[in-house]
Amino acid sequence: QAIQVARTPSSVGKGVVVVLNGYIDGARDVSKCNTTNVATFDSPLVGHLGIVQDGIAHYYKASTRRHTQDSVFDVSKLSELPRVVIMTCYGGMDDMVPMSVVATNPDGLILTGLGHGTIPQNVRQITQNAKFPTVRASRTGSGMVSAVPQDALANYLVCDTLSPQKARILLMLGLTKTKNLKKLQQFFHEY
């Protein structure tokens, strides 16, 4: 089916897609939702872009986010990307892990928080105003993480609807262009 989708003229300009079990999903929004089921890929927040029927891709919507050829990112001349760490938060988390992560001085940090990306108070105190960009994300698997008043105080960015793993990739790419927090946040709303 993936080959059928790739050769369908209407697929041009759609960006990277995942094709499996008759569904077409945009790479930005798709997630693996089951460890072993063959029907594992889904786009729970925005739904499928289309379907494959009789060997033809039928699109019913398109991503409105920038991607592929429309991207400002060019990694062709880079030998490595900035080091961005993901730290998963949980209730009752002690100070050891966040202090250790901050001490390594990564280029960026993705904080995977509870629910709406909620960060435990002690972790917030340790990571706020770090010398590197810090992005709040959620471990829930779906939904938007939007800014809250405490983010401005802590200099946190938010991942929008990206998973922590995808937020990490976007932050690595963003850091190849700028360290400006406002511009980095703009990338999360554009891509």
Predicted regions located by residue number:
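Accessory alpha-helical/coil subdomains and C-terminal extensions
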Residues: 26-116
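C-terminal non-catalytic interaction/assembly regions of soluble proteins
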Residues: 116-191
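Short beta-strand segments
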Residues: 17-21, 88, 112, 137-138
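Conserved active-site and cofactor/substrate-binding residues in soluble primary-metabolism enzymes
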Residues: 11, 44, 104, 121, ...
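Short coil/turn connectors at secondary-structure junctions
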Residues: 10-15, 20-21, 46, 81-83, ...
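Short, glycine-/small-residue-rich phosphate/pyrophosphate-handling segment
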Residues: 1-22, 26-30, 158-163, 167, ...
